[in-house]
Amino acid sequence: MLQGTLDRIVLQLLSAEPTNGYDLTQRICAISRDTLNVNAGSLYPALYRLERRGLIRARWVQTENGRRAKVYSVTAAGRAHLTDQRETWARFASAMAAVLRVT
């Protein structure tokens, strides 16, 4: 995965719905049809990095089975950052598509 891509994916998915790390990895895998398999060794450093930057926040919740889980959600700063990054990502994706069409 390209540098920064995981951060972008995490922000995008958390903007749709707050969730815990395990469910986030499952959603990434399902949405990408098993193309993107993110392990805990990559995901949790990304979550901590985004939290330190103030783009997401974490809170502990009690699950249905009585366990505690850390749920992550996007902050206002994270939503603004995501909006800015959408244009950048669209340009990047367009450029990559053009390069990949070269024969």
Walk through the language-model features, giving the residues of each.
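Beta-hairpin "wing" of winged helix-turn-helix
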Residues: E51-R68, S73
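Accessory beta->alpha helical hairpin/"wing" motif in late/C-terminal subdomains of nucleic-acid enzymes
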Residues: V74-G78
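Basic amphipathic alpha-helical segments that dock to polyanions
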Residues: L43-L50
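Amphipathic alpha-helical dimerization/coiled-coil segments
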Residues: S15, R79-T103
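N-terminal helix-turn-helix DNA-binding core of bacterial DNA-binding proteins
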Residues: M1-S42
